[in-house]
Regions:
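A short, polar/charged loop/turn motif at coil->beta-strand junctions and beta-hairpin connectors
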Residues: 57-59, 131, 162-164, 232-234
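Sequence contexts marking disulfide-bonded cysteines in secreted/extracellular proteins
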Residues: 24-28, 149-151, 167-169, 199, ...
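Fungal secretory targeting signals
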Residues: 1-20
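Short, histidine-centered active-site or binding-site loop motifs used for metal coordination
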Residues: 65-69, 174, 241-242
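Metalloprotease/metallohydrolase-associated module, dominated by Zn2+-dependent proteases
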Residues: 158-160, 205-266
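Metzincin-family zinc-dependent endopeptidase catalytic domain
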Residues: 83-216
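Soluble non-cytosolic domains of exported or imported proteins
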Residues: 75-83, 174, 178, 232, ...
Length: 266
């Protein structure tokens, strides 16, 4: 998105991820159609909760990791890829979102390794695996303006551009919990501060407190909307706080993930 944080580049050592303390996300803004659908989902979810019903069920996701680099030596190691999957799995398993490591690919291609070269679609058409329920994560050398991004779920018949463009892209230096933030978008979640307006709908999820804009670092008790209930959700994976500050999705966010999954990916 247009909102940017400072990216402190990390490195990989012995296959272990060293996590940047802040980042920038380039996931696209919600379209008007996606906003309208989010509003519809919010109404339905609220009605179900009032009736004592739950929309939540077990979701199973095959995960494909694709390492792309300009050189053989620049490719992410098998252990780094395994660590990345393990981080995703650990993040989502408490919410009945079960991830399966379906496989990996490794590709040396200087054009694809730099996202600034405009080769996203050719790369994804060549590398994508699985169906629309499969999360494909592309790990590249360079993302010129961001740490990562994912596409929101949408109508995507197999073989269509929407089908191929789907997935998540990460700079290799941003591997780790940042992938969990981006995967939240792939599952249908917006930023908690979406709209940057205390009085707006925000992320269209009822139980994430109002937030005037993105947080950074890990600012205890930050309250950017003091006239609204709750303090800013600094521990939420969908804020811009430091990844080591993240610990949670809300029940309402998991309702939304299920609504999005049932509509687009089930």
């Amino acid at each position: 998105m247009s909102l940017k944080s400072v990216l402190f580049f990390a490195s990989l050592a012995l296959g272990h991820v060293i996590q940047p303390r802040s980042f920038s996300c380039q996931s696209p803004q919600l379209t008007q159609e996606q906003i309208d659908i989010a509003e519809e989902m919010s109404i339905k979810e609220k009605s179900m909760r009032k009736s004592g019903m739950t929309i939540q069920a077990t979701i199973s996701v095959d995960v494909w990791l694709h390492a792309i680099s300009a050189s053989e030596s620049g490719l992410s190691s098998d252990s780094a890829l395994q660590n990345q999957f393990d981080t995703l799995q650990k993040t989502f398993s408490p919410y009945n979102i079960n991830l399966n490591y379906a496989g990996k690919t490794k590709t040396v291609n200087a054009q694809w390794a730099n996202e600034g070269n405009g080769q996203e679609m050719p790369m994804k058409k060549a590398l994508r695996r699985g169906n629309y329920q499969s999360m494909n994560v592309y790990i590249v050398d360079v993302l010129p303006t961001a740490s990562g991004y994912c596409y929101y779920p949408t109508n995507a018949p197999e073989g269509s551009d929407n089908f191929y463009i789907d997935g998540c892209t990460l700079a290799k230096s941003a591997m780790g919990l940042i992938a969990a933030h981006e995967a939240g978008h792939w599952l249908g979640l917006a930023h908690t501060f979406d709209g940057n307006n205390c009085d707006g709908p925000g992320d269209y999820v009822d139980d994430t407190p109002a937030q005037s804009g993105p947080s950074s670092g890990c600012p205890a008790s930050r309250d950017s909307c003091p006239n609204h209930p709750g303090t800013d959700p600094i521990h939420n994976y969908m804020d811009y706080t430091s990844p080591d500050c993240w610990t949670e999705f809300t029940p309402g966010q998991i309702d939304r993930v299920n609504s999005q999954w049932n509509r687009y990916r089930a």
